[in-house]
């Protein structure tokens, strides 16, 4: 049995997961709500946050029951760090393929389009059932210092009077960090709340340092390991 699992905040990784599930003729399940049932091949799709794995992804991989694993990470054009090797280290499953794909950046409000052609060799290799060794990616030594806190300091989530207290942001937050449109200290700035709000009552405001960073040079490199 093959199953695609994903974590997605603003929708970029969800779009990739749904594409892969369609190509593999299986379903795509959210990591935060997926049952821990054994599968033969798991395809894990997730975003890179501050060169790190989101907490939801770490928790999921630690409990994953799969013989084989393929990893697909999305990043917004800045450094993806060492996320594939770090993800592989959290599970006993044998990794047979890995890819890091540039997509739109959630902090910039960019759409979920991606280059599907980049997945052709990734998909072709899933039938091999041959374990690979992932290389260590370059990672800023300071990226592990409170990444969620740095995101919260650099990016504010604002609530307008359009909020009608529907509670969607509260119930759909993967970190249980939203209370009536106001983020708590558990927020990782995945921006799922902003993307799902039916009233468009939530918006973001980046600080000066983050705006400078987001205006920097971006990469369109695809990292492929098969």
Language model features with spans:
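FMN-binding flavodoxin-like domain, especially the glycine-rich phosphate-binding loop
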Residues: 2-3, 10-16, 22-152, 205-208, ...
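A generic structural signal for alpha-helix starts
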Residues: 8-11, 78, 164, 188
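Short, solvent-exposed beta-strand edge segments and adjacent coil->beta transition regions
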Residues: 154-156
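Iron-sulfur cluster-binding cysteine motifs and their immediate structural context
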Residues: 158-159, 164-188, 192-209
């Amino acid at each position: 049995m093959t199953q695609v699992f994903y974590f997605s905040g603003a929708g970029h990784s969800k779009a990739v997961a749904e594409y892969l599930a369609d190509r593999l003729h299986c379903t795509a399940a959210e990591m935060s709500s997926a049952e821990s049932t054994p599968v033969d091949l798991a395809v894990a799709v997730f975003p890179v946050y501050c060169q790190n794995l989101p907490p939801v992804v770490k928790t999921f991989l630690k409990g994953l029951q799969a013989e084989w694993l393929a990893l697909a990470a999305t990043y917004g054009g800045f450094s993806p760090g060492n996320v594939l090797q770090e993800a592989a280290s959290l599970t006993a499953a044998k990794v047979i393929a890995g890819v890091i794909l540039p997509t739109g950046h959630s902090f910039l409000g960019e759409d979920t389009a991606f280059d599907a052609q980049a997945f052709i060799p990734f998909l072709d290799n899933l039938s091999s059932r041959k374990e690979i060794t992932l290389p260590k990616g370059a990672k800023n030594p300071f990226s592990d210092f409170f990444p969620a806190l740095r995101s919260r300091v650099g990016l504010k989530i604002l609530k307008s009077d359009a909020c009608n207290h529907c509670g969607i942001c509260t119930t759909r937050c993967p970190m249980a960090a939203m209370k009536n449109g106001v983020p708590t200290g558990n927020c990782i700035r995945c921006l799922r709340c902003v993307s799902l709000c039916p009233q468009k009552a939530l918006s973001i405001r980046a600080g000066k340092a983050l705006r400078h960073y987001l205006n920097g040079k971006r990469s369109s490199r695809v990292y492929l390991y098969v």
